Amino acid sequence: MTATIPPLTPTVTPSNPDRPIADLKLQDIIKTLPKECFEKKASKAWASVLITLGAIAVGYLGIIYLPWYCLPITWIWTGTALTGAFVVGHDCGHRSFAKKRWVNDLVGHIAFAPLIYPFHSWRLLHDHHHLHTNKIEVDNAWDPWSVEAFQASPAIVRLFYRAIRGPFWWTGSIFHWSLMHFKLSNFAQRDRNKVKLSIAVVFLFAAIAFPALIITTGVWGFVKFWLMPWLVYHFWMSTFTIVHHTIPEIRFRPAADWSAAEAQLNGTVHCDYPRWVEVLCHDINVHIPHHLSVAIPSYNLRLAHGSLKENWGPFLYERTFNWQLMQQISGQCHLYDPEHGYRTFGSLKKV
């Protein structure tokens, strides 16, 4: 049962009618969520681990025993299941998986290791994203470039940006992973020992697992058992994250004009995917409540989203994953003008 609180009570008078929630505090929205949304349940948390382990096992059994022409299907399944492992680690990074920090850190490192994702590196960068969602030149996740920044960049950089913002959006997380998570200068001095530990963990995993895989199954085995599922994982990682924050209606604001309540409620997208994807990926697509409070475990996101629809429905962006959506995102959402919103690369030729 939710406590219904009108989005704009008589005591809240918006200073800008075009931005009716910009004057609200984030806590005003969070207070409307049922308390049950924030309850951690070990049984549900570990059930998500078992679902992921079972799905990964099924995928690898398929890769091993099904005919070669079934490989694309088994790669898609296994890569999607590995995305579920990332989501388990994602909850650990937000401390919403377990009550004890050491459990979160241990499970997070184990979940991220096969993906070669350094846990603390990701956790710290992701925390920054949550603190500065849709804040121009501060957010670090799919923050669109300005026209000036794009035109001032070297040609090779512009080429890569065009690719990632266009037809190769599905590689975006690979670039983000490789360029951001292993560079110590991206982290405060106080956090660098933790970052070094996480980097050491994934290097150790790679140093043991990759040679063992190649020795026992050959280079093709490395491609078949690790590389292809890993690429499918990055397809989902890139797709989920770009859809979370990239449709033409989403607004990015400079720091002086930024509102946490507006950014987290009205600057994030809920997207429905095929149900099997949502199950294997533990509802990572139910993203709006997660941005309002990272304390909500993944298994409570749907409850929270239902409450948001009841209380804040007009301010929510909801979409369905399909080819038309991805064409819209990759075809229109290229560069950003704070006054007019997204611009396409093609619009530069008309100026």
Curated annotation (Swiss-Prot):
Domain of life, source organism: Bacteria
Membrane topology: Multi-pass membrane protein
Induction: Expression is enhanced about 10-fold by exposure of the cells to light. Low basic levels of the gene transcripts increase rapidly upon exposure to low temperature and decrease again to low levels in cells shifted back to high temperature. The induction of expression is completely blocked in the presence of rifampicin, chloramphenicol and 3-(3,4-dichlorophenyl)-1,1-dimethylurea (DCMU).
Cofactor(s), names only, from the UniProt record: Fe(2+)
Motif (Histidine box-3): 290-294
Biotech use, per record: The desaturase can increase the polyunsaturated fatty acid content in cell lipids, and thus, enhance the cold tolerance of transgenic plants. For instance, the expression of desA in potato plants has a clear positive effect on cold tolerance.
Compartment(s): Membrane
EC code: 1.14.19.45
Null mutant phenotype: The disruption mutant loses the ability to desaturate fatty acids at the carbon 12 position. The growth rate of the desA-desD double mutant, which lacks polyunsaturated molecular species of membrane lipids, is dramatically lower at 20 and 25 degrees Celsius than that of the wild-type strain.
Disulphide-bonded residues: none
A GO cellular-component term linked to this record: membrane
Reaction catalyzed: a 1-[(9Z)-octadecenoyl]-2-acyl-glycerolipid + 2 reduced [2Fe-2S]-[ferredoxin] + O2 + 2 H(+) = a 1-[(9Z,12Z)-octadecdienoyl]-2-acyl-glycerolipid + 2 oxidized [2Fe-2S]-[ferredoxin] + 2 H2O
Classification via PROSITE patterns: FATTY_ACID_DESATUR_2
Sequence motif Histidine box-2, residues: 126-130
GO molecular function terms noted in the UniProt entry: acyl-CoA (9+3)-desaturase activity; oxidoreductase activity
UniProt remark on domains: The histidine box domains are involved in binding the catalytic metal ions.
Biological function: Desaturase involved in fatty acid biosynthesis. Introduces a double bond at carbon 12 of oleoyl groups (18:1) attached to the sn-1 position of the glycerol moiety of membrane glycerolipids. This enzyme is involved in chilling tolerance because the phase transition temperature of lipids of cellular membranes depends on the degree of unsaturation of fatty acids of the membrane lipids.
Protein name, per record: sn-1 oleoyl-lipid 12-desaturase
UniProt gene name: desA
